[in-house]
């Protein structure tokens, strides 16, 4: 029986772990950006359905308040939807920015893997909540949960740095950067195609 030398076993494990990190990051970025082309239609649907959705009874007054913030010549439904979409994106990004230090400190204390598992499960739950949401309130909660659980991007970078030799670190970080680019290309394309297919 051939036994693989320990050094080769370790090298294979590191490569496998790096590939898993990249795959995890790619899936998260696709899930994050998939919604971009869908937001206008989603918001239009939720705004029109709010009157018949008890959970969204607060939405029409809130939409009227937001509409009042716009200049008088820019209070059309389309411009209202654009503004609300921007607010939703800001909420997600603000939460992501706010909780990233917490997830980073926690990963230093209990390890990268448990934090990656927690954040990945949280993101998966947010995507499921969004997929099955029947009201704007549920959709908003899914974005809040997603933003709060989006600390895995920093933890993935830290994990990649931990398992990479200093001489290879620039290349490894470049691979993560390329993953960001691929995720932000594939996500909107998949979202746009799914809207055309009425998924």
Q: For each predicted feature, which ranges?
A:
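Pair of pore-lining "gating" transmembrane helices in MFS-fold secondary transporters
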Residues: 15-61
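Cytoplasmic helix-loop-helix junction between adjacent transmembrane helices
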Residues: 142-180
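Extracellular/periplasmic helix-loop-helix junction of adjacent transmembrane segments
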Residues: 42-96
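Residue-level signature of mid-helix packing/kink "hotspots" within the transmembrane helices
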Residues: 89, 93-101, 151, 184-185
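Interfacial helix-cap and linker-helix signal at transmembrane-aqueous boundaries
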Residues: 43-44, 106-107, 190-198
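Glycine-rich segments within core transmembrane alpha-helices of 12-TM secondary carriers
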Residues: 173-191, 195
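Conserved MFS/SLC helix-loop-helix module at the cytosolic interface between two early adjacent transmembrane helices
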Residues: 97-134
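Hydrophobic core of transmembrane alpha-helices in multi-pass small-molecule transporters
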Residues: 26, 126, 137-151
